């Protein structure tokens, strides 16, 4: 939906020159006033505070957004805001990248994470750079020491490890 659109039939590129709404199979909606969108490659460059909204609860907003729907990648420059309404958290910053398929991303330059999952308390985290990644929730069983076999580690399907980056030394966390 748009009131003004310039479309090049040779390059399959639509130039967005007014308020525009692009819908992909009822699962992703793009709202923008300025930029371009290629109907063949599903790549777009969105300007002037645009928004990408997914039906799964994810919303990406920024001054300039490069978005590749095919590989599920978004890069934001200027006033980034990534809202995850399913997990009830918002990621803010000046620059960032999001990978939809792997459910991870990062934000830098005035990076802040707000967790609003608890209705009585908000948790704020601020750092130079914040990385976000989704880890599956796992339950563990405590076993008696003598019941663990020597080769039980080798039989594990997937190693249970978490990587921690200690490069960034200044971090603040506070709640409201």
Identify the role of each PLM range:
Residues 1-176:
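Mature-chain termini and adjacent capping regions
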């Amino acid at each position: 939906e748009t009131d003004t659109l310039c479309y090049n039939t040779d390059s399959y590129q639509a130039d967005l020159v007014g308020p525009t709404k692009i819908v992909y199979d009822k699962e992703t909606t793009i709202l923008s006033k300025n930029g371009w969108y290629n109907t063949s490659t599903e790549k777009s460059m969105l300007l002037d505070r645009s928004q990408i909204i997914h039906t799964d609860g994810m919303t990406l907003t920024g001054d300039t957004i490069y978005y590749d729907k095919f590989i599920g990648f978004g890069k934001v420059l200027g006033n980034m805001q990534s809202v995850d309404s399913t997990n009830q958290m918002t990621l803010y910053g000046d620059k960032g990248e999001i990978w939809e398929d792997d459910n991870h991303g990062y934000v830098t330059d005035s990076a802040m994470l707000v967790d609003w999952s608890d209705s009585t308390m908000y948790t704020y985290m601020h750092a130079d750079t914040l990385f976000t990644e989704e880890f599956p929730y796992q339950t563990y069983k405590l076993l008696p020491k003598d019941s663990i076999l020597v080769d039980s580690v080798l039989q594990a399907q997937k190693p249970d490890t978490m990587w921690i980056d200690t490069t960034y030394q200044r971090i603040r966390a506070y709640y409201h």
